[in-house]
């Protein structure tokens, strides 16, 4: 028998994911300041994707609330 689909804490888990992504974004931003141009470009591209993820996660949180 499959496990029941318990989504009662989805919003909380999503919020935690948002915070972790923000933390990673900030750490990467600090690292980029000390990196060479090639690495800095890669970090900036990844941070752009992180911003998109944060927007998506926040939208999901709204849907869950």
Curated annotation (Swiss-Prot):
Factors inducing expression: Expressed only in the forespore compartment of sporulating cells.
One GO term of the biological process aspect: sporulation resulting in formation of a cellular spore
Presence of keyword Transferase: no
Pfam families, per the entry: Tlp
Domain of life: Bacteria
Keyword hit for Iron-sulfur: no
Primary localization class, coarse: other
Record keywords: Sporulation
Localisation: Spore core
Family: Belongs to the Tlp family.
Family annotation (HAMAP family): Tlp
NCBIfam families registered for this protein in UniProt: SASP_tlp (TIGR03090)
Name of protein: Small, acid-soluble spore protein Tlp
UniProt organism field: Bacillus anthracis
